[in-house]
């Protein structure tokens, strides 16, 4: 990855630079309830989102679903599902609005997470990985457009996105280690933690959507 990323780093140039230096922090956006709720949902979402990515291989080996050689490819299946989730729902987000897409997909992600411990065969695990990868991929890819929708000043949209992503990164920082500690009590605990975090994220994002545009589902937001 480092090798391939070095190519655009070396050859890309900015077409135009901003006339003024933009701040790294904008306290005014914190007064926006939809933005605050979405950022909180982002925190919970990233807290639980990547737990299966870290532990699905160990789960498969410990439950004799697949050996070490086969279970290695389950992570690949998660990423294969993520490809579909990052592309197709974003197409519909252009028509309906990113917030209208984010909520149902993160909610479905929590449903799949709660079903994790009911997986007992390789076929079931393949289906789990593809669907979870799809729904989680949508959340990861659509967060940026959703934040742009919630920004109250497009000249500071980069600042607002950076602030929200920084807060969301804290959830990613603590989520997987906490799941590892919970794993000492069995697999139900980290799976429940993953699903609960995703549900909290869905509720916060729903709150952001309602605060932004009300309960009218026809509003593009």
Name each region found by the language model.
Residues 151-188, 194:
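A late C-terminal transmembrane helix in Major Facilitator Superfamily
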Residues 138-153:
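Intracellular juxtamembrane helix-capping segments at the cytosolic ends
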Residues 112, 123-132:
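Paired small-residue
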Residues 1-20, 41, 204-208:
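C-terminal membrane-cytosol helix-exit motif in multi-pass small-molecule transporters
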Residues 66-75, 102, 121, 125, ...:
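Juxtamembrane helix-start elements in MFS-like secondary transporters
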């Amino acid at each position: 990855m480092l090798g391939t990323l070095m190519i655009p780093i070396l050859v890309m140039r900015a077409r135009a630079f901003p006339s003024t230096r933009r701040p790294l922090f904008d306290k005014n956006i914190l007064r926006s309830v939809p933005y605050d709720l979405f950022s909180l949902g982002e925190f919970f979402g990233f807290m639980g989102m990547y737990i299966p990515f870290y532990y699905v291989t160990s789960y498969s080996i410990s439950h004799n679903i697949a050996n070490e050689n086969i279970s290695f490819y389950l992570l690949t299946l998660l990423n294969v599902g993520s490809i579909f989730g990052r592309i197709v729902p974003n197409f519909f987000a252009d028509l309906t609005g990113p917030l209208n897409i984010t909520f149902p997909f993160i909610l479905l992600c929590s449903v799949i997470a709660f079903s994790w411990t009911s997986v007992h065969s390789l076929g079931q695990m393949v289906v789990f990985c593809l669907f979870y990868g799809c729904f989680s991929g949508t959340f990861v890819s659509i967060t940026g457009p959703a934040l742009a929708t919630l920004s109250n000043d497009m000249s500071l949209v980069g600042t607002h996105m950076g602030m929200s992503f920084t807060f969301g990164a804290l959830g990613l920082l603590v989520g997987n280690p906490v799941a590892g500690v919970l794993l000492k009590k069995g697999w139900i605990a980290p799976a429940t933690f993953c699903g609960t975090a995703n549900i909290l994220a869905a509720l916060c994002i729903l709150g952001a959507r309602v605060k932004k545009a009300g309960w009218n589902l026809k509003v593009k937001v």
